[in-house]
From Swiss-Prot:
Cellular component aspect of the GO annotation: cytoplasm
Matches recorded under Gene3D superfamilies: Periplasmic binding protein-like II (3.40.190.10), Winged helix-like DNA-binding domain superfamily/Winged helix DNA-binding domain (1.10.10.10)
Assembly and binders: Homotetramer.
PROSITE patterns hit by this protein: HTH_LYSR
A GO molecular-function annotation: DNA-binding transcription factor activity
InterPro entries xref list: LysR_subst-bd (IPR005119), Tscrpt_reg_HTH_LysR (IPR000847), WH-like_DNA-bd_sf (IPR036388), WH_DNA-bd_sf (IPR036390)
Family recorded in the similarity comment: Belongs to the LysR transcriptional regulatory family.
Protein name as it appears in the record: HTH-type transcriptional regulator CysB
Organism for this UniProt entry: Klebsiella pneumoniae
Keywords for this protein: Activator, Amino-acid biosynthesis, Cysteine biosynthesis, Cytoplasm, DNA-binding, Transcription, Transcription regulation
Ranges for domain HTH lysR-type: 1-59
Encoding gene (name): cysB
Length: 324
């Protein structure tokens, strides 16, 4: 059994059982991957993948267990490399962060600028996607950190640490009837077409929850994953915008009126997540604390030692998080 074979079977699953796509991603040949997978199956005396002709159709029950363990083994191999790197070149390495557009555009720029200045020999890579894609990327080992608000609870294998609370703002054009109001009720908001985030992005679930709680149905006419796109369509008069407050800037958005929505929606919490098996390099601890100053190395280590994310939630229950 070779590590290469374990990597191949994991990557085949990551590429939805498409061996050709797997070969392209690994810069190798399709026959080479197929041969190594067969050799591993022959050695183990069991099928990892069910087949129809030359095509893989599904992972067998035994294969699912083997894939799970293979992921753990490969994660440990990565940890060994990280330990060696920490002792040899503590300020050199790589960091892969998976996050949403809102975090990348509005919450992370200052953090990343300071981090790169401090660690010029660490290559930082950012992947943007939906919260589900982000959590999955970290769960599969394709990213070190997931930073998001939605969907991280779906991945129990991630350690999830609360970073900050945030809420939404209502944005309208100056000529809109709501523009002169000091405050807006959810009943008033329900009277207008809304422009907001796609479901599953940037706290959208809280918007739906607030309307359901009030027995109302929001009239959503346009959704997008990008707050800048939403603001563009608000300017075009398509509807009332509901976006993260941090995404509205009086300097860059002087033509929009920002209305507080704290009385309508409950706050959301952005978290940073990573695999429990991840060996955190010193610069990774530093990145976490730059993003969330209350998450010191000692606090992170204490949280990682807890058994579940429910225990982590309890640990932070009485800690006042920053507001954005």
């Amino acid at each position: 059994m070779k590590l290469q074979q374990l990597r191949y079977i994991v990557e085949v699953v990551n590429h939805n059982l498409n061996v050709s796509s797997t070969a392209e991603g690994l810069y190798t040949s399709q026959p080479g991957i197929s041969k190594q997978v067969r050799m591993l199956e022959d050695e183990l005396g069991i099928q990892i993948f069910a087949r129809s002709g030359k095509h893989l159709t599904q992972v067998t029950p035994a294969g699912q267990e083997i894939i799970r363990i293979a992921r753990e083994v490969l994660s440990k191999v990565d940890a060994i490399k990280s330990v060696a790197g920490e002792h040899t070149w503590p300020d050199k390495g790589s960091l892969y962060v998976a996050t949403t557009h809102t975090q990348a555009r509005y919450a992370l720029p200052g953090v990343i600028k300071g981090f790169i200045e401090r660690y010029p020999r660490v290559s930082l890579h950012m992947h943007q996607g939906s919260p589900t894609q982000i959590a999955e990327a970290v769960s599969k080992g394709n990213a070190d950190f997931a930073i998001a608000t939605e969907a991280l609870h779906l991945y129990d294998d991630l350690v999830m640490l609360p970073c900050y609370h945030w809420n939404r703002s209502i944005v309208v054009t100056p000529e809109h009837p709501l523009a002169t109001k000091g405050s807006v009720s959810i009943e008033e908001l329900a009277q207008y077409p809304l422009v907001t985030y796609t479901f599953g992005f940037t706290g959208r679930s809280e918007l739906d929850t607030a309307f359901n709680r009030a027995g109302l149905t929001p009239r959503i006419v346009f959704t997008a994953t990008d707050a800048d796109v939403i603001k563009t369509y608000v300017r075009l008069g398509l509807g009332v915008g509901v976006i993260a407050s941090m995404a509205v800037d009086p300097v860059s958005d002087p033509d929009l009126v920002k209305l507080d929505a704290n009385g309508i929606f409950s706050h959301s919490t952005t978290k940073i997540g990573f695999r429990r098996s991840t060996f955190l390099r010193s610069y990774m601890y530093d990145f976490i604390q730059r993003f969330a100053p209350h998450l010191t190395r000692d606090v992170v280590d204490t949280a990682v030692a807890l058994r579940s994310n429910e225990d982590i939630e309890a640990m932070f229950k009485d800690i006042k998080l920053p507001e954005k």
